């Protein structure tokens, strides 16, 4: 760090898959909480640098929010519903501690669901798009394996998310601040899946089957953010539509399947 002398540090490294955290809670907590602490401690002890630091928390910190408390603003109580979410509560608090205790220019985001091309196939929309692409090429039977389809999510495009992160650290950054960031379109996982299927060349043939292995013991079932604070501060607004994001995601998996790449079916 002292050699590179960064102006900005974006800390997004994490064990970021909630379902994995149920089977690997210790690794998730260590990676996400202690990993954040080690990075911020290292930056604190570096000489002659004072970067603006983005610590990426998660909307999962809010967990199971009653419908009457929607949309979720920054002051909504934490109610984490997975070891991953607990680890992100720790990440969130470690970041704010370093801002308050040491004056480091740390800002924290609670990003709601964002997706697009290249998102890993452990996440619902990516595994659905991947399965659809494989079905279109007759690589698997026309059955999409799913988990819980009733959770409500607010969707944004990863390209909008990256733009938000850049604006976070460049538009009047305020040490210790924390922001909810997310899209404006929300729907259930089922509705998202139905939209992806509607884009398929084999939409009339595709069936849906619940796979118990894909279900979490507990889920954050209502994720609708109030992003007023960040929008008012930075001027950021999502620009890419849900429909465009889903189209691009499916095209990404079609191109990977068409390339002949070998990968596991999830």
Show where each model-derived region lies:
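NAD(P)-dependent short-chain dehydrogenase/reductase
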Residues: 65-71, 93-167, 184, 189, ...
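SDR active-site strand-loop-helix element
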Residues: 9-13, 53-59, 109-111
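NAD(P)H-binding glycine-rich loop region in Rossmannoid oxidoreductase-like domains
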Residues: 1-31
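Mid/C-terminal beta-alpha module of Rossmann-like enzyme folds, strongest
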Residues: 128, 171-215, 227
């Amino acid at each position: 760090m002292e050699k590179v002398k960064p102006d900005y540090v974006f800390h997004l490294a994490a064990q970021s898959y909630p379902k994995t955290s149920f089977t690997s809670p210790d690794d998730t907590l260590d990676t996400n909480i202690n990993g954040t602490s080690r990075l911020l401690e290292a930056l604190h002890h570096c000489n002659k640098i004072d970067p603006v630091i983005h610590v990426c928390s998660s909307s999962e910190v809010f967990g199971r929010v009653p419908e009457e408390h929607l949309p979720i603003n920054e002051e909504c109580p934490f109610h984490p519903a997975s070891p991953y979410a607990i680890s992100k509560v720790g990440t969130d608090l470690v970041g704010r501690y370093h801002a308050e205790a040491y004056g480091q220019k740390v800002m924290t985001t609670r990003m709601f669901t964002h997706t697009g091309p290249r998102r890993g196939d452990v996440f619902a929309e990516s595994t659905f798009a991947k399965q659809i692409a494989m079905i279109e090429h007759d690589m698997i039977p026309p059955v999409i394996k799913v988990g819980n389809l009733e959770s409500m999510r607010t969707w944004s495009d990863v390209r909008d998310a990256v733009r938000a992160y850049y604006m976070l650290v460049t538009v009047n950054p305020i040490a210790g601040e924390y922001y909810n960031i997310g899209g404006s379109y929300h729907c259930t996982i089922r509705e998202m899946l139905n939209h992806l299927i509607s884009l398929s060349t084999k939409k009339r043939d595709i069936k849906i089957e619940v796979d118990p292995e894909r279900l979490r013991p507990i889920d954050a079932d209502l994720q609708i953010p109030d992003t007023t604070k960040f929008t008012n501060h930075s001027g950021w607004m999502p620009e890419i539509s849900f429909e465009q994001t889903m189209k691009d995601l499916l095209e990404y998996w079609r191109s990977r399947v068409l390339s002949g790449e070998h990968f596991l079916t999830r």
